[in-house]
């Protein structure tokens, strides 16, 4: 009996391990086969040793990539002053404002002028809070596990965005110079403030749903929403400061000499110095090879305000986007541009090139997915906005590389700029916003077609940060 007990006791771990492996799981035999097939040459052991104390990118770096040293550009839009979004996801706002400020600097021969990002960000966060709460009211009768309702509560608020936010906030609330409402700590470091507001929004969203379940009418819920927004406003003003309603500002030229001193409201300042219909003067273009080209698409909930513009874009082959961007640069007009900036980015040189790192050789495996497959599988999407402002053309007028003005401060990249090869542009460029005057009439007609609606959880719902 004792021998039987000991035998069972010794066999128990093996039986338990075997019982834990269900169909489709990794069995001990499978694991042993995988391990036995691993290469173990001297080179493999040396590589493992090297990677134990070195970054992957450092070992995969291609030292012979010519893109790392070529900083000449045949066509470039002048700019003054590099902005810095610091530890925030406001690149979309900095980029849109960089486009606007470049025009203002050129027109009035100013120095390194900046709009207040903090002022516009304040109202962006208030508008996004209202967007969430009103969407909760609109969908209050749907179950909590409805896909849209679930998406809303997963994404109540973000500091990221698109050019739509620039359109909405500047045209609705105007703009002010940076010195009128300067950056605060919580404008530069948004994560804690955003998480606190998001927590409050989820609480409020749940309360609105509970009110609807008790039979409260939409008018009652919307009245409660206004009270809730009062709390959000208080959090924002405590963290970012109270937005000015009037201010005095002295315009100075590039040499610092005063030009004029006037009283403004944010709206009058915008109308005098920007004065542009941002919602109707621009065309939003996308390169998404996972979907049919020459069609217009819009993504549900991909907007900054409830009554604002939704991200609606004309999908074009990359070969049709490039000539439009080149025409804009030749006209000294910058563009809102966004891409998947983390792919093949060499932070030491400020260069984006598909030849920067050779991961295939390092790990002895190919990475064959093309751009369309990367989009479909959520492996790549737009992640960061910058200002497209230079292109280098060869003798035949073909682009070889591009340059963007970034918002990571003057000490990052190439004096605050990033350089991308034309091949990288093909693979990881997603959005560019171009003035209509550079777009052919046939494309404008396509842009005005009724767009195909995509759900909020589509792979291309991605905010620039």
Regions found by a protein language model. Give the residues of each.
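Stable alpha-helical elements in mature extracytoplasmic
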Residues: 87, 95-96, 100, 162-171, ...
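Papain-like cysteine protease catalytic cores
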Residues: 117-247
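Bacterial Sec-dependent N-terminal signal peptides
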Residues: 1-22
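Second-shell loop/turn segments in exported
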Residues: 77-89, 151-157, 308-315, 324-325, ...
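Post-signal peptide N-terminal segment of secreted/secretory-pathway proteins
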Residues: 67-139
